[in-house]
Amino acid sequence: MDDRLWEPQNPQKTRMWQFMQSVSQDQGQKFDSYQDLYHWSINNPESFWENICLFFNLGFDSQDYEILNKYPQMIDAQWFKGVHFNFAQKLLSRKDNHPALISINEHGEKQSLSYKELHHRVAQCIAGLKNLGITSGDRVAALMPNTAQTIIAMLASSALGAIWSSCSPDFGAEAALDRLGQLEPKILFCCDGHQYQGKKHSALDKISILHETISSLERVVICPNINEVLDISQLPKACYWNEFILPATECSFTALPFNHPLYVLFSSGTTGRPKCIMHGAGGTLIQHLK
């Protein structure tokens, strides 16, 4: 019985095949199958990850670095020591009119941003964050949906070396506090509300609770999502997105160590308070590329 579920019609046109040829040329070793490549990769992890970086042209080869340190235990392993780069800069390397982001709401309304437009909007958000004194190591949190605006805020935060974390806007205030409150964020991006099965749900009550409860907050930025007009007169730290961003055309990026924190994600919270899980910028980038 053939257990194969699927195979490409033209294997030699796949990115996997191209990577195999690249590794073969670099290593002087012929790979006849995926299994050959797999066994080589697990026996030569340093060479494998170095070849991933070369294949995707990350530019690390121009720096003096150690791929993997000599570690007594696995937990002590440190990758690409000496490499400095910026996660957002790698993602924003293009500035053309090719679509960069496409988001669609539940009504089927589509928003598309080109790389050029995305770069411009991230630059404006970076300027807004800089104006508030955000710098490397600060935490930036969000209660936002999967929209272009959320990605813009994330990229702007990582451009400065700030650490990003977010929750879905349909979380209750307590669930959001259990997660984001642990981080002591300086900035919180919140949508004005969310929509589910055609019904709009205002976020004002949740925003008010987070505004009052997270003492580390210096600014709460409210982003349009359902075009709800919120009364924020009693929230002195709150402002709207258009009040927060500043004029800018070029992004500024801070070069950071390979393992600099990028995201904080969370465990499910089913057996207790959600636990923070930190993901580094370098590992996230090359894993996504791979």
Predicted regions and their residues:
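Conserved AMP-binding/adenylate-forming core of the ANL superfamily
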Residues: D36-W40, L101-L155, G172-L177, S233-E243, ...
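A short N-terminal helical cap/helix-turn-helix that marks the beginning
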Residues: I42, E50-D64, K81-I102
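Structural core segment of the AMP-binding/adenylate-forming
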Residues: A159-W241
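N-terminal amphipathic, basic-rich helices that act as targeting or association modules
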Residues: M1-I75
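Hydrophobic alpha-helical segments in the ANL/AMP-binding
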Residues: Q89-S93, K130, A148-S168, A175-L177, ...
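Conserved pre-ATP/AMP-binding loop-to-beta segment of ANL
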Residues: N97-P99, V221-I222, S233-F266, R273, ...
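Conserved S/T- and glycine-rich ATP-binding loop of Class I adenylate-forming
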Residues: V140, S157, P261, S267-T270
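AMP-dependent adenylate-forming
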Residues: V23-Q29, A88-S114, P224-I232
